[in-house]
Amino acid sequence: MASSKLLKERIESIQDTRKITNAMYLISSSKLRKARKNYQNVLPYFTRMRDTISRVVPHLPDEPVHPFFHERQREDGDPRRAYLVLTADKGMAGSFNQNVLKLLLEKADRNDRFYVIGQVGYRALRKDPRLVREFQYGATAPSLQRARDITVDAIDDFKSGKLDAVS
């Protein structure tokens, strides 16, 4: 039979664990409220964009006219594609990062190139010779300028003929 001292220590340990768990619950509840608020703030924008796109798409010509919409065919038949790889900055996204990297490595050929956004993707692909550029932007404050920074290299490589498609 356990001594009363051991029982008291065990009870205190359980109470401490309960306090920590409660604090974690409060923090996660606060973060969830903040995420829901952010979602509600951007929802009208995305709804409007979806509605606008759904009105415009039926009026587009059958054949896209801009060269960015065409995948160039190479004489050897093996196009050089660029993949914009979006991963998290930390490994706290469940299996998301692993699934993205697994799909990338299944789809990519030896001639393809990777533009990686996120620290997890960079750490996984940093020794891969197909890595062209990595972007260490945090996801906390996305901006139009960051989006331009990310796409300018891929667009320039496409225009110069180094790439035949961007995915």
Model regions and ranges:
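Conserved loop-to-helix interface motifs that mediate assembly, gating, or partner/ligand docking
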Residues: 2-167
